[in-house]
């Protein structure tokens, strides 16, 4: 007969991280918010899809706001107070995600746009004709 296995608790440890970096990746289809410490270790993350939105609604500013609020709530539980914000991508949820982080109680010290721009690299996809 098999031995009963021991139940172990959650492997997540509560860390006290006073300041970190919020990475907001905003595409036309989704918005992903990752909050890391200064070394780059992810402390909290959320996305529009993880917040319960499906399909075309994931790309809306309200979905980005909801995702940012959820990530900020988890970061505040870890003791985070100040963040720098790095925004990447052309999506519609950029400004609302930043505003949601601020309203949630995180002090924003820096906002930087780190959208990658090609120096004429790969060929663009052909234009849509609708």
Swiss-Prot record:
The keyword Ribonucleoprotein applies. One of its GO terms (biological process) is translation. InterPro entries: Ribosomal_uS11, Ribosomal_uS11_bac-type, Ribosomal_uS11_CS, Ribosomal_uS11_sf. Keywords: Ribonucleoprotein, Ribosomal protein, RNA-binding, rRNA-binding. GO terms for cellular component: ribonucleoprotein complex; ribosome. It holds the Pfam family Ribosomal_S11. The keyword Metal-binding does not apply. GO terms for molecular function: rRNA binding; structural constituent of ribosome. NCBIfam families: PRK05309.1 (NF003698), uS11_bact (TIGR03632). Located on the platform of the 30S subunit, it bridges several disparate RNA helices of the 16S rRNA. Forms part of the Shine-Dalgarno cleft in the 70S ribosome. Belongs to the universal ribosomal protein uS11 family. Part of the 30S ribosomal subunit. Interacts with proteins S7 and S18. Binds to IF-3. This is Small ribosomal subunit protein uS11. The lineage of its organism: Bacteria, Bacillati, Cyanobacteriota, Cyanophyceae, Synechococcales.
């Amino acid at each position: 007969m098999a031995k009963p296995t021991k139940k172990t608790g959650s492997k997540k440890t509560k860390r006290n991280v006073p300041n970190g970096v919020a990475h907001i990746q905003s595409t036309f289809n989704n918005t992903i918010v990752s909050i890391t410490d200064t070394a780059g270790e992810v402390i909290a993350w959320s996305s529009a899809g993880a917040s319960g939105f499906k399909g075309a609604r994931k790309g809306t500013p309200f979905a980005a706001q909801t995702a940012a609020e959820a990530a900020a709530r988890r970061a505040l539980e870890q003791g985070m107070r100040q963040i720098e914000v790095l925004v990447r991508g052309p999506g519609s949820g950029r400004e609302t995600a930043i505003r949601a982080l601020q309203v949630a109680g995180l002090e924003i010290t820096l906002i930087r746009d780190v959208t990658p721009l090609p120096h004429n690299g790969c060929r663009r996809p052909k234009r849509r004709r609708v």
